[in-house]
């Protein structure tokens, strides 16, 4: 289902491209029988049977098992509010959902769409609807788009959406949807009305499908997902569970979490299969790595961000921002990666990383993700030996340079100041060249170009803290 937004937009043209395997392939290659149009309605862990309904004939049967694996996934949230079941109010989770949206767009000649929810799926759908020639608006209940980002990094996404003509409203939580006199749909609450649209797509998250497990008496974790141990075993002997429906552990915080990601589900499935087959295997948790490609720009992240840390009451962190190119500047095509590295102020332990750029962002995020899983520090990242050629990187890679800045801060060699540190007593020293200052002047700063700084140090105050930026 990761490809569904691109199927709606026509980037993926054929439904068959989304189907990775057929029942015949499973039977001939693996000797596995696949029962389509059959629904499991109950599990009896004591008797080791599942109740199954044949949806074609209506026949019910009890099927025995030796070992059982649950992989029910997650369902899109559809809040119980007025108008949520009106024609044209839709969700996207399955191929039939995507086909229904495509049909509705064609049959109703949709010209304007409203996407409620500006997370990963919401943004991907918004992009693909816009590329298909539909005017798109986004509504997000949180304080900024793409909530897994911190507020500062999300501003790059704001600029990207604005540049491509997608309207965004944040801090708006719909309490209902109504049909207007002109036939269009409109979301609303007590103090706000959305734009009118021909189609509303709800993309406000998913909930784990736990009904079967709950009815069977399986333990449900504090996150509302199925509890499993490190071998993917549930609380019932002979029953394993994997994927979007299960609870896992954040490897950085040690706390329980849910992470509905395809890569996580794949790894959990292998662990469960190994455990059933008697091979030693453990799923050690997640660090939270994700990526989105939006209008040619990559938005990637791993670990914790400063908003998450602040909400949890954790103040033992520091961060450094950077805008290094994906490869050396003298080779054509260099473009910046806007990045933020978060680490422990007390010991330099890596906590998280976000990278946004036209090229190379995901590669750097993967490097940090791998180190996060190893409990590494900024010292490890600073010394990481990464690929280099003029076309592919720099001798000191973009991610090395961020780590080196963090090391310099930890060691007191070059302390970092943030925007919040600026006050009336600060002396702001802008060391950019005059042409650069004209492009983006900073109010209240004194410009002494770096090329002239050594000869003009007498112009600097001795009684004020000097904050330098470039």
Predicted regions and their residues:
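Mid-to-C-terminal Rossmann-like scaffold of FAD/NAD(P)H-dependent oxidoreductases
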Residues: 245-359, 391-394, 398-424
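Glycine-rich dinucleotide-binding loop and its adjacent helix/turn
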Residues: 70-132, 167, 222, 228-230, ...
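FAD-site-proximal beta/loop scaffold in flavoenzymes
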Residues: 85-109, 183, 194-274, 367, ...
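Catalytic cysteine-centered active loop of the rhodanese-like fold, especially the PTP/DSP P-loop
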Residues: 448-450, 454-470
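Rossmann-like dinucleotide-binding cores of NAD(P)H-dependent redox enzymes
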Residues: 18-19, 112-113, 120-178, 261-264, ...
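AMP-binding/adenylate-forming core of the ANL superfamily
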Residues: 50, 55, 68, 198-201, ...
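Beta1-alpha1 glycine-rich phosphate/pyrophosphate-binding loop at the start
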Residues: 1-39, 126-149, 289, 363, ...
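A Rossmann-like FAD-binding core segment of flavoenzymes
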Residues: 35-52, 56, 63, 131-228
